C-alpha cells in the first residue's frame, strides 16, 4: 500500500512543482535578498524557528540567497531551471502570478525607503530583474502576471518599462503590523470601493487583470459595500459581466466550497489549498 501524500513545505521547489503540474497554475511571492537576488518567500521575516535563526537578522532582505537556500527556500532561478516546471509553464500554458513584496518598514532596508520615490525604485528594480529572467527562459507574456499591494503600481511599471501583464492588489496594505491590524486598515478601503469602481480603476491604469477579494461575492460582506452588489446569482453575474467588458477577474481566496460558483461566474479562482 502506498503512503499517504503529504504536502511539501511552502516556498520549496517541490511544492511549487507539485502545484504547477497538478493545477492550472501557481502564485508565489518574490523578495529581493541582501545580494540582490530573487527568492520565493511570503513573509518579511525568515520562516524558520528562532533557534535556527540564532544571532542572525530575522529579515529576509538581510539574508543572502545562499543563506536562504541552505534553509530550504527556493530562488526564482531554481524554479526556472527545473525542467518539469518549465515544461508546464512555457510549453503547456500554465499561468503564474508573481506577487512582489516590499521590505518590512522596520527592517534596515525598509527604513531606508522612507520616500515614496525610493519605494518605487526598489519595486521597479525587483520587477525588472524578474522580467529579465522570465524573458531569458522565453516564458510567454500571457503566461505571467506581476502584481503587488503597492499603491499606484503603475509607477514602478513605467519606471522599469515592464512589458508583462500587471495589476495592483487592493486594498492597499502596509508592510508592518499584525494580521488583525492589516485587516483594520484594509476594510475601510474595501467598503468604499464597489466592484464597478475597482474595475474602472484597473482599466484606467492599464492593468491586464483585476485581482479581487472573494468577500465581494459573499452575502455578509457584500451587503456592507457601498454601491451595487455582485454575487453568484444570475442577475448579479450579468451585472458583473456588464462591468467587466471582457476584463478577467481573479478572485481570492477561492476556497473549495466556492470553486464551482467562481468558475460558473466566469472568474478565475486563486486558492492556497
Question: Can you describe what each PLM-predicted range is?
Answer:
Residues 1-273:
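Phosphate-group recognition and catalysis centered on beta-loop-alpha active-site segments
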Amino acid at each position: 500500500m502506498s503512503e499517504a501524500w503529504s504536502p511539501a513545505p511552502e516556498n520549496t521547489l517541490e511544492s511549487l512543482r507539485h502545484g504547477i503540474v497538478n493545477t492550472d497554475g501557481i502564485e508565489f511571492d518574490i523578495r529581493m535578498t541582501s545580494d540582490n537576488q530573487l527568492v520565493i518567500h511570503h513573509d518579511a521575516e525568515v520562516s524558520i524557528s528562532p533557534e535556527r535563526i540564532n544571532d542572525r537578522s530575522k529579515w529576509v532582505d538581510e539574508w543572502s540567497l545562499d543563506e536562504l537556500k541552505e534553509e530550504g527556500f527556493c530562488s526564482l532561478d531554481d524554479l526556472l531551471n527545473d525542467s518539469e516546471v518549465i515544461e508546464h509553464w512555457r510549453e503547456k500554458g500554465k499561468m503564474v502570478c508573481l506577487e512582489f513584496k516590499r521590505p518590512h518598514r522596520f527592517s534596515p532596508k525598509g527604513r531606508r525607503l522612507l520616500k515614496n520615490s525610493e519605494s518605487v525604485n526598489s519595486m521597479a528594480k525587483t520587477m525588472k530583474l524578474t522580467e529579465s529572467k522570465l524573458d531569458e527562459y522565453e516564458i510567454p507574456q500571457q503566461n505571467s502576471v506581476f502584481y503587488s499591494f503597492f499603491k499606484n503600481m503603475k509607477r514602478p511599471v513605467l519606471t522599469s518599462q515592464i512589458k508583462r501583464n500587471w495589476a495592483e492588489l487592493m486594498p492597499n496594505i502596509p508592510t508592518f503590523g499584525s494580521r488583525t491590524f492589516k485587516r483594520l486598515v484594509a476594510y475601510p478601503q474595501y467598503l468604499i470601493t464597489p466592484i464597478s469602481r475597482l474595475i474602472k480603476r484597473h482599466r484606467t491604469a492599464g492593468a491586464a487583470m483585476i485581482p479581487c477579494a472573494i468577500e465581494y461575492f459573499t452575502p455578509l460582506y457584500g451587503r456592507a459595500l457601498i454601491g451595487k452588489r455582485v454575487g453568484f446569482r444570475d442577475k448579479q453575474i450579468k451585472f458583473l459581466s456588464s462591468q467587466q467588458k471582457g476584463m478577467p477577474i481573479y478572485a481570492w481566496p477561492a476556497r473549495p466550497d466556492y470553486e464551482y460558483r467562481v468558475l460558473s461566474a466566469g472568474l478565475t479562482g486563486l486558492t492556497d489549498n
